[in-house]
């Protein structure tokens, strides 16, 4: 009986040692995205860039519509109509190029901002984990249950928005 108790005690000690060495935490990434001022600023920057391109495209579209209406004028000579048709063709080409450029630049800008945000969040999570001697950090949203004591989201948010 004493041998069984020693084995049981040794097993419990081993299990207790394992559970203490598995220090982990979680970060609610949805909350970080939703509440971070840093991320909101990056999104605003992207939105401004989008609005700038939308304005340029709308201006070209209005100009194109005006040219098309003037082409319908019966007062224009054939030579003037040909000139207007070439202007329309040129403007349509410019508009297509602008749309492609806008899409490309916005995609690139979005990727740059996402990488910058991701890198900063990872750096903060790593720093926080090292300070607290945490061995692993998970996304709270992928866990079925967690004790709120292991949630370091607010610390990450505070550091991110400094």
UniProtKB/Swiss-Prot annotation:
Protein name: Uncharacterized protein aq_157
InterPro entries linked: Chaperone_Skp, Skp_dom_sf
Pfam families named in the record: OmpH (PF03938)
Source species: Aquifex aeolicus (strain VF5)
Keyword ATP-binding appears in the UniProt entry: no
Lineage start: Bacteria, Pseudomonadati, Aquificota, Aquificia, Aquificales
Keywords carried by this UniProt record: Coiled coil, Signal
Leader peptide range in chain numbering: 1-21
Family recorded in the similarity comment: Belongs to the Skp family.
GO molecular function, one term: unfolded protein binding
